[in-house]
Amino acid sequence: MFTGIVETQSEVLGLANGVLRLARPRFFKSLKKGQSIAVNGCCLSVNDFSKNEIEFCLMQETLECTNLGQAKAVNLERALPADGRFEGHVVAGHVDGVLAFLRSEGERFYFQMPTDFSQFFVHKGSVALNGVSLTVASESEKEFCICLIDQTLEKTNLGKLKVGDMVNFECDLLAKFFLKSLREK
């Protein structure tokens, strides 16, 4: 489980034959094989690592429903330890899909509304974009808006978005469970 509070960004060193290679952040000192790390919000298991690199194996499904095949720099967050401080919101690392960045107006960033998931986008609700825990500021049939503070713009890859860039999204897990429970009644 993750919180959507990104620890750092990393450069994508390469992607070939389903193996994603990232530059290893200096403070990621105690890595182990099999450890879960959210990469642009997608939960991946460390396959191998060295002093300077971390390696992950990606399935075709992962490449098809995320932006990892096109990413140059990614957000990283290690899994929340059992005794860790919980901030952000519950992020499973199970990306729902990708959507397009439409425009920004100051601190307001607008994204394409994913039609099949629009019921999970509510004013003041949570969403993870590229693994970042965010609050929906407004929503309509075609788009939704989030507001980004300077720290988020500097610490994550959201500050480098260009119109048309695709971002990973994960809807609020609690909202998914709540809606499912209502449908089953």
Language-model features: where?
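Conserved loop->alpha-helix
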Residues: 1-185
